Amino acid sequence: MPNLGVPELLIIALVIFLLFGATRLPNAARSLGRSMRIFKSEMDEMKTDGDKKELAEKQAPTAEQQQAQDLAQPKSEQPNEHNA
């Protein structure tokens, strides 16, 4: 695959400028920028959702272990008035 140098990139930019015109290029760039921001925010949201799920999965076994420990420990009986 050939390497693109500065002259080739300038020719490509000129062709794009001629195809889309001076009025549509800024709008296209703005639209592309908005799309990139939305994409990045969605990716960050997906990462935080994944972190929350991992944290919940780590905490869930500890809650189950706590319930198992509560069931395994015998409850001490309080002396009643009837037993005295």
Swiss-Prot record:
Q: Subcellular localization, per the record?
A: Cell membrane
The membrane topology of this protein is: Single-pass membrane protein
An annotated GO cellular component of this protein is: TAT protein transport complex
The keyword Transcription regulation appears for this protein: no
Query: Which InterPro entries does the UniProt record give?
Result: TatA/B/E, TatA/E
Q: Name one Pfam family in it.
A: TatA_B_E
Any transmembrane segments, and where? 1-21
Kindly indicate whether the keyword Transmembrane belongs to this entry.
yes
Chain intervals with Basic and acidic residues compositional bias: 42-57
Q: Name one GO biological process term.
A: protein transport by the Tat complex
Q: Where is this region: Disordered?
A: 42-84
Entry-linked Gene3D superfamilies: 1.20.5.3310
Instruction: Spell out the Polar residues composition-biased ranges.
Output: 62-77
What GO molecular function annotations does the UniProt record carry, in alphabetical order?
protein transmembrane transporter activity
For this UniProt record, give its keywords in alphabetical order, as a comma-separated list: Cell membrane, Membrane, Protein transport, Translocation, Transmembrane, Transmembrane helix, Transport
| Subunit comment | The Tat system comprises two distinct complexes: a TatABC complex, containing multiple copies of TatA, TatB and TatC subunits, and a separate TatA complex, containing only TatA subunits. Substrates initially bind to the TatABC complex, which probably triggers association of the separate TatA complex to form the active translocon.
What family classification does the UniProt entry report for this protein?
Belongs to the TatA/E family.
User: What does this protein do, in the record's words?
Assistant: Part of the twin-arginine translocation (Tat) system that transports large folded proteins containing a characteristic twin-arginine motif in their signal peptide across membranes. TatA could form the protein-conducting channel of the Tat system.
Name of the featured protein = Sec-independent protein translocase protein TatA
Q: Which gene carries the instructions for this protein?
A: tatA
